[in-house]
């Protein structure tokens, strides 16, 4: 399941809340951080970072970039890095676990002028295409802001796309565009309205494409805002409606 949206819409917050709910329901969850700029997702999840990112484990950005260049020169369609794998087979070098909740970072921008994030997109795409999960297992993918991951093909290996829509024109335009792209790729799609109050709910709904399935509505929460400001885990924050959202996805 891929979660996207504009910057500040609450993607990482929703990923964390859904992951916690799934964990408490007895599922095994891996959260994949595909945002090369996000630095604090593990904190709100309540999971320690692993020793290295997946990109580092594969030899670093230079190694992956070299493979991509080789693919272009040979006119191959895509990079092949991974064989078929399960959650249990993933190395503890790049995945950290808190009971049945795991956390994996694809890669991060570490230096000035190090270049684009395309190699990270290629790694994420191939990883998601080769990971196989059981019925009680979930993978939640937290993406960077916008829709660049659509262009990189990251959505290729996911079953469901969720766009987080906060009260802004940018969020509405992005949701409608993402819905169009997801439909072109025959992907299940839904939206979660976030930071909502009664005065704007109907306005927001009226501006979204009428074919978009609204999975749920989450009110603005000062508890979430304070937890995020302090860098605390959202483990103790209660939000109504998460079970209903998961039922819509199932």
Regions found by a protein language model. Give the residues of each.
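Conserved catalytic-core segment of NTP-binding enzymes
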Residues: 17, 119-217, 225-226
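N-terminal phosphate/diphosphate-binding loop that engages ATP/GTP or pyrophosphate donors
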Residues: 23-98
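Conserved lysine of the Walker
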Residues: 11
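Cytosolic-facing regulatory segments adjacent to core modules
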Residues: 79-94, 102-139
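Walker A (P-loop) phosphate-binding loop of P-loop NTPases
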Residues: 7-8
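C-terminal boundary of histidine-terminating zinc-finger modules
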Residues: 228-239
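Hydrophobic anchor at the beta1->P-loop junction of P-loop NTPases
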Residues: 3
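Residues in the short beta-alpha loop(s) of Rossmann-like NAD(P)-binding domains
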Residues: 35-37, 195-197, 221
């Amino acid at each position: 399941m891929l979660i996207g949206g504009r910057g500040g819409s609450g993607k990482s917050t929703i990923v964390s809340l859904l992951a916690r709910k799934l964990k408490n329901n007895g599922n095994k969850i891996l959260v994949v951080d595909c945002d090369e700029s996000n630095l604090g997702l593990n904190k709100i999840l309540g999971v320690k970072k692993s020793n290295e990112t997946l990109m580092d484990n594969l030899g670093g950005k230079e190694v992956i970039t070299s493979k991509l260049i080789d693919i272009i020169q040979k006119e191959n369609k895509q990079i092949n890095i991974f064989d078929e794998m399960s959650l249990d087979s993933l190395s503890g070098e790049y995945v950290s676990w808190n009971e049945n909740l795991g956390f994996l970072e694809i890669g991060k921008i570490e230096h000035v002028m190090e270049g684009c994030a395309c190699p990270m997109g290629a790694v994420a795409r191939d990883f998601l295409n080769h990971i196989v999960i059981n019925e009680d297992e979930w993978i939640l993918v937290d993406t960077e802001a916008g829709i660049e991951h659509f262009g990189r093909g990251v959505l290729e290996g996911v079953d469901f796309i969720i766009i987080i829509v906060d009260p802004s024109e940018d969020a509405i335009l992005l949701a409608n565009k993402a819905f169009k792209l997801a439909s072109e790729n025959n992907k299940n799609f839904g939206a979660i309205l976030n930071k909502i109050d009664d005065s704007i709910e109907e306005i927001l709904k009226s501006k979204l494409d009428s074919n978009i399935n609204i999975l749920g509505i989450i009110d603005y929460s000062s508890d979430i805002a304070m937890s995020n400001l302090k860098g605390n885990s959202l483990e103790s924050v209660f939000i109504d409606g998460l079970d209903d959202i998961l039922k819509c996805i199932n």
